[in-house]
Curated annotation (Swiss-Prot):
Signal peptide: none annotated. The lineage of its organism: Eukaryota, Viridiplantae, Streptophyta, Embryophyta, Tracheophyta. One of its GO terms (cellular component) is lipid droplet. InterPro entries: REF. Coiled coil: none annotated. Residues 1-32 are annotated as: Disordered. Residues 1-12 have a biased composition (Acidic residues). This is REF/SRPP-like protein At2g47780. It comes from Arabidopsis thaliana. Disulfide bonds: none annotated. Belongs to the REF/SRPP family. One of its GO terms (biological process) is positive regulation of growth.
Length: 235
């Protein structure tokens, strides 16, 4: 009996083998999601989207031009094969470098935002948000009137200088051969459409349309005076 008890005790004292439990399938998707989040752009994703859109447009235009190349299409395809053979190894090696650089800059932007959130006091943030709210609630009429006054002052200041340089340029062009003959044919049409343009500007100005104050008028009368003076000098 003693021997049997010793054998039983030895069997119980032997360490049990622990079989490793394979990771459940539910844990692997979380790792994949984390990897995907690490490879996503947070702030500069619009640059990636614009690059993809530009590449798609360029590829479409290139294929359209190649299809319409006619007899040159075969030569273009041969050049494509040569370029593909030379640049394929470089592309395989460096094709992800631009995205990694963009990802690096994106993470730096994220770090800057984190630092700002850390060091800027909450009162300053609150004041900034209140200032933004007040700015968005400013009456449109006040802003438009201010902009109108600025535009009017700029126009009154630079319009005489523009007229002077335009007159000087006109006199220089009149010295060119055949220019006066061509000008006499073109000027009536130009005056007609200039008058139509001025009528349109007056129309939108009388109805107080937004932006009408910024549209300049063509000084047809002053241009006519310059032409008459030049004609009198020529005679």
């Amino acid at each position: 009996m003693a021997e049997d008890e010793i054998v039983v005790e030895e069997e119980q004292s032997q360490p049990q083998e622990i079989t490793p439990v394979p990771p459940s399938s539910s844990s692997s998707p979380s790792l994949v999601v984390e990897d995907d989040d690490e490879m996503k752009l947070k702030h500069l994703e619009f640059i990636q989207v614009a690059a993809v859109y530009f590449a798609a447009c360029f590829s479409t235009l290139y294929e359209l031009a190649k299809d319409n190349a006619g007899p040159l299409k075969l030569g273009v395809e041969n050049i494509e094969d040569c370029v593909r053979t030379v640049l394929a190894p470089l592309y395989e090696k460096f094709h992800d470098v631009p995205f990694k650089l963009l990802l690096f800059v994106d993470r730096k932007v994220d770090d800057v935002f984190f630092d700002v959130e850390t060091y800027v006091p909450s009162l300053v943030k609150q004041a900034s948000s209140q200032a933004l709210t007040v700015a968005t609630e400013v009456q449109r009429t006040g802003v438009v009137d201010t902009t109108k006054s600025i535009a009017r002052s700029v126009r009154d200041k630079y319009e005489p200088a523009a007229e002077y340089y335009a007159a000087t340029l006109w006199r220089l062009l009149n010295q060119l051969p055949l220019f006066p003959e061509v000008a006499h044919l073109v000027i009536p049409t130009a005056f007609y459409w200039s008058e139509k343009y001025n009528d349109a500007v007056r129309y939108v100005g009388d109805r107080d349309y937004f932006g009408a104050e910024y549209l300049p008028m063509i000084p047809i009368e002053k241009i006519s005076d310059i032409l008459e003076q030049d004609q009198c000098r020529a005679d």
